[in-house]
């Protein structure tokens, strides 16, 4: 039986003072689908996904996840619903090592009465998850601030995937990684698609989006200007919508 979209965003808007960062945006994401949110820097992409993940509360509009309205839910509550987000700034604690970041706020405990953290189990869990994702991190005890951009991205992705995400949002995940890191990320997205886990993939790179997403939602100046299946459009057409030289047909 068709359960409908796992994520439904309906008419959401967000203001910061007199600036309308997101203006009446709607879209849906179905199981096993990779949807690209595409637009230039400053278009409102990150603000949009932060409303979905619970960081911001929409000023207008509604969001549903798995058939439930998410109004008032915090990022922690969204994670408990297994919607995981990898933010553009990665949201890592630089003074902690990889395993502590992966388990941050969800630490493994030796003793639930005295709240003693089980560092060994956390280290083993972090190592296994990073290995599964094919991210190389020679020293799990190194502080996150001392890691390369690709290694930091690997920790952020491992933090999301360790908890068996049902839905993953990735905000410009390849911005600070090299070629090998990009390959790992593209493979992860493909593997999630095969498992039926939907992905919202945020990027300003149209060619990158065309290589991995099923459907493109173009955001320009806070508004959704067009939505296209990538197999039914071209890179040039989508670029035209991004820069404003093309208009969606009414």
Which residues fall in each region the model found?
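Glycine-rich phosphate-binding loops of nucleotide-dependent enzymes
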Residues: 2-250
